[in-house]
């Protein structure tokens, strides 16, 4: 009887708790939600710093497909 109680407790209580914890643990979604709360100036600074990190292409290599304004 004790073994059946342990098995029932495991599947009816512990297993659902473990799956609920996995559903709530989504760091990428939380990170995106936090970034949406920034004011427009902070978002602009973040975007500008990301754009500055891109390297310009070599003018000799450049063709009509270069859209970033470096060529």
Swiss-Prot record:
MF GO annotations: ion channel inhibitor activity; toxin activity
Keyword Secreted applies: yes
Known tissue expression: Expressed by the venom duct.
InterPro entries given in the database record: Conotoxin (IPR004214)
Key words, A-Z: Disulfide bond, Secreted, Signal, Toxin
Locations listed in the record: Secreted
One Pfam family linked to the record: Conotoxin
Cystine bridges: 56-66, 57-70, 62-71
Signal peptide from the UniProt entry: 1-24
Gene Ontology cellular component list: extracellular region
Residue span(s) of the pro-peptide: 25-54
This protein's record includes keyword Electron transport: no
Entry domain remark: The cysteine framework is III (CC-C-C-CC).
Family: Belongs to the conotoxin M superfamily.
Entry protein name: Conotoxin Qc3.1
């Amino acid at each position: 009887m004790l073994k059946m109680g342990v098995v029932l407790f495991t599947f009816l209580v512990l297993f659902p708790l473990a799956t609920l914890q996995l559903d709530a643990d989504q760091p990428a979604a939380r990170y995106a939600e936090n970034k949406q709360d920034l004011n427009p100036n902070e978002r602009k600074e973040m975007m500008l710093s990301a754009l500055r990190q891109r390297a310009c292409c070599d003018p000799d290599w450049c063709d009509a497909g270069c859209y970033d304004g470096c060529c």
